[in-house]
């Protein structure tokens, strides 16, 4: 996108602005649409020599700035865009800069599991901090300990309430939730929300390639319907291995969900040709209609991230968004992108600035699947 489609963003008397790079402008627009605000104006583009240029059009002095930019494909360009945007806002005297990174690229490179290899997830954290970010807002990191790589505050949201809410509407009976050890903690929350038992798939990674081997299924799955839960779907090779293993164990019907739809080459075809009934992902990474195939459904993180932005700006707790205590996480599933609420920007039902948990009268999740 040459010159990001951006406009000034404020809520009532609150002085905070939301801007976007080119990684996922549609998510940024949906966040602002949920908040009933305009998107901040900035030009973010690439010269013919592949140098990235950022020019902020609005006055950012002393503003609380939120930059929406998942570090997804093209990963390295998205990272550089974000770093340059942060630098531009720092030099424009922004009061605080929050990098909103729904998908954290290089998240798998979080440890030295072989000799003479980098910890790139830590390097990216250092780069964001040195560039001038004051805070990070992200969703379902590959490993939670990545938060410890930062010397600035990190708020990690989770999509498990949105994803489980989708399946709760289906009223699937005789259900088991299946995951691997790496996502077991979040999957436990998902299983509790679904009121279903949890089964674990034991697997191991082979070499440096995106290849894994499924070794065993731990738990009673025979004769049940299964939802496979993970943080991301990349090549879908591991997902299909799990599907095949569950079929051998006697599972009768299978679904899958993940926060991040990386969907590398061949993934959609593998999913379409599999025994999976449906695969549900979020829009942390843009997923065009042609990349969804016949079985992939996309629900939006926009309401969740929007609520977190307002809470961060107002100094309120973000932790409440990680629990089932916040009722709007279920109501979000009904938010229709084609008929957003008619609301004066930043006002609640009584005409005052909206409080978190009720920014619009019936906050509902945006379904960007096109279905």
Q: What annotation goes with each model-predicted range?
A:
Residues 1-371:
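PRPP-associated nucleotide enzymes
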């Amino acid at each position: 996108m040459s010159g990001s489609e951006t406009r000034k963003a404020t809520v009532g008397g609150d002085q905070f602005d939301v801007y976007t790079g080119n990684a996922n402008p549609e998510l940024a627009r949906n966040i602002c649409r949920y908040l009933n605000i305009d998107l901040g104006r900035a030009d973010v583009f690439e010269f013919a020599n592949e140098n990235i240029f950022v020019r902020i059009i609005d006055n950012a002095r002393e503003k609380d700035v939120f930059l929406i930019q998942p570090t997804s494909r093209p990963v390295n360009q998205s990272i550089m865009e974000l770093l340059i945007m942060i630098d531009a806002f720092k030099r424009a005297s922004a009061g605080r800069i929050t990098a909103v990174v729904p998908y954290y690229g290089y998240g798998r490179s979080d440890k030295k599991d072989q000799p003479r290899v980098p910890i790139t997830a830590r390097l990216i954290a250092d780069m964001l901090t040195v560039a001038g970010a004051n805070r990070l807002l992200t969703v379902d990191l590959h490993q939670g300990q990545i938060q410890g790589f930062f010397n600035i505050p990190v708020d990690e949201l989770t999509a498990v309430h949105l994803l489980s809410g989708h399946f709760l509407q289906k009223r699937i009976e005789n259900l088991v939730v299946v995951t691997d050890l790496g996502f077991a903690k979040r999957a436990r929350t998902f299983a509790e929300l679904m009121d279903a038992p949890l089964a674990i798939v034991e697997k191991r990674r082979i070499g440096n390639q995106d290849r894994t081997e499924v070794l065993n299924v731990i738990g009673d799955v025979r004769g049940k319907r299964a939802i496979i839960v993970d943080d991301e779907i990349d090549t879908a090779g591991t997902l299909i291995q799990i599907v095949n293993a569950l079929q051998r164990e006697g599972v009768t019907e299978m679904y899958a969900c993940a926060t991040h739809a990386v969907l590398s080459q061949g993934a959609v075809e593998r999913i379409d040709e599999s025994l999976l009934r449906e695969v549900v992902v979020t829009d942390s990474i843009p997923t065009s209609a042609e990349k969804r195939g016949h079985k992939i459904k996309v629900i939006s993180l926009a309401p969740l991230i929007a609520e977190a932005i307002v809470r961060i700006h107002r100094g309120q707790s973000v932790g409440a968004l990680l629990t089932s205590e916040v009722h709007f996480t279920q109501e979000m599933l009904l938010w229709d992108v084609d008929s957003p609420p008619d609301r004066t920007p930043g006002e609640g039902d009584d005409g005052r600035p909206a409080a978190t948990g009720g920014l619009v009268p019936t906050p509902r999740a945006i379904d960007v699947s096109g279905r």
